[in-house]
Amino acid sequence: MISPENITGLILAGGRAQRMGGIDKGLISFHQKPLIESAINRLKNQVGPILINANRNITKYAGYGYPVVMDETPDFSGPLAGFSVGLKACKTSYLLTSPCDSPLLPLDLAARLAAEMERGPFDLVYASSLESGKTWAQPVFCLMRANLQDSLTAFLTKGDLKIDRWFKELKSSTVIFDDAQAFANVNTPEELKILEAAL
């Protein structure tokens, strides 16, 4: 059994947030608290150590008491850049990734992905959601083995940043969650208002 202590949680807060006007999404207020706080609170009982991947406002993020890791690639290169620095900093056997702007992320995310990982062997297991009879991949909600650093470095060296293409190079599986809203994220001011009103 994979224990929570053997999983490092990586909260991805390093994006450019163009659709939010370039505002740092992790620091946007959601019910009077920054989104990063919701991510920490929903993740902290599921994992051991926590890392925050951020590329600006480093001091503010560091104020939450967790190590902050910055992308090593320029120009906000996407979630794989965050995965890469997270894997390098990870001291446990597994890394669980989650974006900072999904304040309803499942409280059993780690447990369910870990159960599927043990059913493997798999390199990584990601979440999917069921909505209107369709299954939608949620690849940034992902549990991966910490030994994937070399694979990811080689992939990024080719100049590819597409998360689904890296997954195809690996032994992967998915876990389907019935509550699609659990993965709802905030990309625009309108989505923020809708999500706040739903709670």
Curated annotation (Swiss-Prot):
GTP binds at L12, A13, G14, K25, N53, D71, D101. It holds the Pfam family NTP_transf_3. Its cofactor is Mg(2+). SUPFAM superfamilies: Nucleotide-diphospho-sugar transferases (SSF53448). The keyword Nucleotide-binding applies. Its EC number is 2.7.7.77. It is found in: Cytoplasm. Its main location: cytoplasm. Transfers a GMP moiety from GTP to Mo-molybdopterin (Mo-MPT) cofactor (Moco or molybdenum cofactor) to form Mo-molybdopterin guanine dinucleotide (Mo-MGD) cofactor. Monomer. This is Molybdenum cofactor guanylyltransferase. The lineage of its organism: Bacteria, Pseudomonadati, Pseudomonadota, Betaproteobacteria, Burkholderiales. The gene is mobA.
